[in-house]
Amino acid sequence: EETGKAAGYISTVTGNAEEGFIITNTITSVKISKVDITDQKELAGAHIQVIDKDGNVVEEWDSTWEAHEVTGLKPGETYTLRETVAPEGYTLTSDTTFTLKEDGTVNKDTTTTTISDNGTLLVEDSRTSVKVSKVDISDGKELEGAHIQIIDQDGNVVDEWDSTKEAHITEKLKTGKIYTLRETVAPDGYLLTSDTTFVLKEDGTVDAEKTTAVSKDGVLLVQDKLATTASIAVTKKLTYIGENLAARDQTFYVALYSDKECTQRVSDVKALVFK
């Protein structure tokens, strides 16, 4: 006779009254996988917790390329699956809950966690995704023909493209890191814009408080101004002891730059003509 069940075990009874009964207690076991929501491939680098109804963490681990096995959970009790750290390039997923039936299998009727065909619980993460649009600053229309780069904190170009009439989508950027948006080639008739920066929050959205790039409806905007035509007179003088010298055998060239480092030229190179 068994008067009570051991917590975290499944009890099975075999035999008969004539020969006797055998009660076998088997510890409960459930597998949990951390996967990409798109292709269901295992993801390493997440920190996962299993939390009981009283808020106690009964199991936690860092995900690897294989499913994690949790044993000794109580049938009939509701547990919470929580991700506290997402893999790089992914967003934190929301909490889900699950319950085991008396036979140790997952109760699909009381479980919000995704369950695979083999009964494994899936903690699904989405890749970070951000849209970048190249637009005219005056009317917000998309501009094609610009070359845009996204640069990480170490100066590495993690994505680059030539703008089209549609926004560009960049995936798997790290949350909480500062990225630089840089335009290296402007569309014909437009001026190069200055660098801006942006940061993604843990849920994958743009962190407005830490972002200098203009953002509209979650889309980062690289805004260009139309180049305007103007002329400027440049005079080159050579003097010696207060006297102007003629230097007809020398040619000097001038150009205008938009930055003090003189890396962003905004005019043609012109030769000075002596008059």
PLM regions with names:
Residues 1-275:
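Solvent-exposed loop/turn and edge beta-strand elements of beta-rich ligand-binding domains
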